Amino acid sequence: MKESVLRYHPRLPELGRTDVPRSEIADQPHELHAHLLNLDQPVYLLNSPDGLATWIPSQTTSEDQLTQSLIGILPVQSPSLLGDSGFCQPHRTRYAYHAGAMANGIASEELVIALGQQGILASFGAAGLVPSRIEAAIQKIQQALPNRAYAFNLIHSPSEPALEIGAVERYLQYGVRCVEASAFLDLTASIVRYRVAGLHQTNGGIEITNRVIAKVSRTEVARRFLEPAPEKYLKQCLDKGWITQEQANLAAHVPMADDLTVEADSGGYTDNSPLVILLPTMLKLRNEIQAALPYSTRIG
């Protein structure tokens, strides 16, 4: 079936005629397949005497050329061109993608490592795991991805605050530079501690070393992450010796999150909001806050 489809002579209007090196014409099924999967280069569709063919121009020159009928052009469609390019630099990724956490280690070390090696940020599913298990995951992932992006989930645990505190302590101890904050109904001292402990004054401004991606489904929670840390949590962190006074002062100039993941109705617990309504609402809220404060938080 595939062979007959590929050999079909398309009745498409000719865009023009072009000279193509004979050696670069792909007219076999496996060659066509390889060309169409190459998203990083433009692919030219040709109506050759033998049927549909493709051509990816190279830098080489050849005297053995055939004049071909050009019927279409597939432009570059590299995944690296999709999304907000501003996501890639701070998160050290190739792609503006984030693979969110799945609890109890379902988003495993192996998954985080495999995606990280391809330049994609993924979160380890730390929710539901004790701090010692999280520590083992940190060590394994850091060994495999010494210079690559990765993140760890930080889930709000109102009934077991020790788990939230223990996770943050491990993240700070091992230098985990990005957490995905989920299930928060409000900010807590633990998430504020993680964020603010990574603030430093530099000649160029404020350096943020601890990144936060907040997964939210309610606008009132989104607002908490789009704005700076509240004074009451900063005071708690200062009283416990978790942050310095300088870091508390710097916290007034940065939002709590670098990125928001808008969580619409899905297979797990959500607030049953359809994405077509929730996403524009979150974007509107972000824009309103940015108009009043010099912050830039990405939303996806």
Stretches with model-predicted labels:
Residues 1-300:
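Active-site entrance/lid segments in N-terminal catalytic domains of soluble metabolic enzymes
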